[in-house]
Amino acid sequence: MITTVQEISKWRNLCFIRMQSRKWYPVLKKTPLVADGRKIIKHADKVPHPGEIIHPFYQPTAIEQFTACATEYNPSLLDGKKIAPSLIKHPVSLKTILVDSKLKFDDIRGVNRWLMEFVARRQHQRNIVLTPASKSVRSFHVLHLSSTDIAKLRGLENVLSEIENTNDLQSRVESVNNELQNIFDRDSKQTRLFCEDILAYLIKNYGNSTENLILLINVTEMQLFSRLDQMKAMNIILYHILCKVEANENPPCSPTLVTALENLLAAINNRFFPGRCENSLHPIVIEQLLSYFIITGNLNESKNFLGHLIKKGILPEATIINRYLEAIDVHFDKSTKIFDIRSKFAFIADLAPIIENYGTIDLFKFLIPMCRHFDELCSLLNIIRKSNNAKQAVDSTLPIFIKKVLTFTKDPMINSGNLSTVFNIVSPIYGQNVPSEFVEKFILSFALQGNYTMMAHMIDTYKIKLSHKYQLQIIRALKNSERNHALKNTGAVGYNKEFKKYFIEKYLNCTEREALRP
């Protein structure tokens, strides 16, 4: 009972904190994406707001939604396990934190409303249309320098040659900058010689070495607060710098070059914007920066630029996305630890529209190991089933799906049910004529569960030829099943001794039968 004014005030403050913690604060760019796995955050036990969940492909099925809405006590999704990656506000520090949340409600009230908003958000992601960026680079290549203008740059070219062997970067930058200033002082206003054209010309013709490129990047930074007064000019210069970074492969990204380019980007932000400059960069330049940060292993910046492209309705190149996924795997060493999977989800949260509508085989292969619940796996498989390249994607990923199904539980009956679900999802893709190589993998997986009925059913239905080698594989799988599930389901239909005897006598040769005799 609340009896005092102090208790009432305390109760109101607590309610306010809880209400505040359920709001959505989209501050991904300012959020450390690698979470602190050593901290146990009790607030993650609360069901997050649908907008706080960053899972890019989980979609509860109609049956899951119905079950949640029809369960009076503790309705849940994903069995209420703490595996829903979420960005939430910490109730005390009010910092945005990355946690694995439980989708387990206290009671049935509000579940339907929560599901409607969650499903609506997923539908919005499915409806996002992305188009590749225009590859026209004409505006970057047209330099407004006449032969007369280029002749005026001879002094600048001579300075670049004279200081080539000078080790002092600062003095080299000052020498080039002084000569650049002399050109503008001598030049009449009628010729309209622009700083960005000169720098782009120099980068294109003299930026072939890492040292010269660093020099010209530093000169560009010095000119930011004098003659480079428009983002259009910076787009041109950045384009040529990043083209040279990509072309100069020995080495492509030395630490000094990385520092110089990042200092230039920071200076651009300070010069034109209070925060970040992505909104004013050309999509081609954003793609270049994305590739650059992927190469240098800067995942946070890679995520920022990738997310910005997607928000602008631009579909990044498949090769760039693949390199991004490879960089994530390298960073986490292809780990399947819970903490690492949670952090990996943060880095791919922006990919939801791509997963839904433009998924590639490499992307699907990356996502399968990240599933921690069978319902997640089904969501991903349903996305593949509806994709334009469904058959090719299933051909490449089905063996991985079958293997992954058996990792969620050790219960042979649940595993058998899950295997049957996967088989039923993919069968229509093949017109009910699933290739024998995949049917054989399903049979071996059912053998690992000791499910004689399903093995016999699939052998008969798909007329699988039981070669000597394949029979030995079945026997090894059945032996593993007997060791792993010795005390489970021995009396269940399809698993008991009578079915075992029937299967052995009908499907195995005499020489193979003895291997399974008690």
Swiss-Prot record:
Residues 1-19 form a transit peptide. It is found in: Mitochondrion. GO terms for cellular component: mitochondrion. Keywords: Mitochondrion, Transit peptide, Translation regulation. One of its GO terms (molecular function) is translation regulator activity. It comes from the Eukaryota. Belongs to the AEP1 family. Required for translation of the mitochondrial OLI1 transcript encoding subunit 9 of mitochondrial ATP synthase. This is ATPase expression protein 1, mitochondrial. It comes from Saccharomyces cerevisiae (strain AWRI1631). The gene is AEP1.
